[in-house]
């Protein structure tokens, strides 16, 4: 194997995504012959580009995210005079393997991209600022200001790939799982006679009689796998979507008790936490396979095999003695797996084509007082602060009108605010002056 580099399998990464910023609006006045001030003609800024994750059958691993941990979409262009709106920022589409689960920083699952082509909008581009032509109205016929573009969303997300398979082969290292999947499908996993030869799941498609299903060869489990020992959590993750669990037991191994080994694996499966509505791993249909019967030569070894079959049949209905090398017993085994897969529903939930993260249903604003300063929080007022060009008195006046219409002035009165009190919104501090007509705030930077 010297000189050969095996592709790295990466199934869990944390990635930052930054959407594009919206372009600024333009404040300009149309000039015509004999009409030096013919009205506002500033265009609006373009929206920033958004970022989407798309499930792609050609992707098998998240290795590209390991090499690049931050993705950014392009910004929207600024508006121009003569009613020219800025171009929208280009959206960015990032491919991920089918079966990728997406989690926020708090560990909450946002989406499960299972179906090929399904998309998730992970961050939304910032809104472009309105030009003064769009702001013109009855009260302001020729506004001499425009709104600034908003920054795009930024998020840090955890991506996890969970294999999409109907059947999972589980067991201790070196029990022959890779040999079995190689014998019953066209998969070509690495096979060797030492532990942990398989370091990532191998998938194979099985066609047995009228049945067609997928099988995953899960890397060897050890005691404590459900707690992360021996990369156990990474391996158990790939069993979550399977309908059937196949316990592979090396019946020729005299160093380990097969029955206690089976119980230990069952314990690890029972302790692994699956999704809220999913069936626990140890409660799913299970099949026991006694592998490597081709090496059993003596009568004592044959008697041990019969004893194991009788014991396991008291625990599980389906028990098969097979040899991946001679292919003995594989036909009956694969047909039965097909029947079980058809009988039991898949744990994979199909996803819609495009998923948008819903906005949180929160009050328009809230008001509290800390250290003598009234603090206003809320999506709308904080967004308006970001849109305001504070070098323009007219823009500040427009902001004050919007805040007043939202009910912030009335809320300040009810809270006992008096003239001269400081009010903070989105990190900007104002001095409140309710006596000023149509503009309740004067800026105090």
Curated annotation (Swiss-Prot):
Per UniProt, subcellular location reads as: Cytoplasm
Names of required cofactors: Mg(2+)
Q: What is its EC number?
A: 3.6.5.-
Does Metal-binding appear among the keywords? yes
GO BP, sorted A to Z: ribosome biogenesis
Query: Which amino acid positions bind GTP, per UniProt?
Result: 171-178, 196-200, 217-220, 291-294, 323-325
Q: What class of enzyme is it?
A: hydrolase
Output the InterPro entries linked to this UniProt entry: G_OBG (IPR031167), GTP-bd (IPR006073), GTP-bd_Obg/CgtA (IPR014100), GTP-bd_prot_GTP1/OBG_C_sf (IPR036346), GTP1-OBG_CS (IPR006074), GTP1_OBG_dom (IPR006169), GTP1_OBG_dom_sf (IPR036726), OBG_GTPase (IPR045086)
Q: Which SUPFAM superfamilies match?
A: Obg GTP-binding protein C-terminal domain, Obg GTP-binding protein N-terminal domain, P-loop containing nucleoside triphosphate hydrolases
Example GO molecular function: GTPase activity
Which amino acids does the record list as binding Mg(2+)? Answer: 178, 198
Q: Which UniProt keywords apply?
A: Cytoplasm, GTP-binding, Hydrolase, Magnesium, Metal-binding, Nucleotide-binding
Q: Which positions fall inside the OCT domain?
A: 357-434
Q: Report domain OBG-type G positions.
A: 165-342
Keyword Hydrolase found: yes
A Pfam family of this chain: DUF1967
Ranges for domain Obg: 7-164
One cellular-component annotation, GO:
cytoplasm
Q: What is its main location?
A: cytoplasm
Family recorded in the similarity comment: Belongs to the TRAFAC class OBG-HflX-like GTPase superfamily. OBG GTPase family.
The record's section on HAMAP family has:
GTPase_Obg (MF_01454)
> How does it associate, per the subunit comment?
Monomer.
Q: What does this protein do?
A: An essential GTPase which binds GTP, GDP and possibly (p)ppGpp with moderate affinity, with high nucleotide exchange rates and a fairly low GTP hydrolysis rate. Plays a role in control of the cell cycle, stress response, ribosome biogenesis and in those bacteria that undergo differentiation, in morphogenesis control.
Protein's recorded name: GTPase Obg
Give the gene name: obg
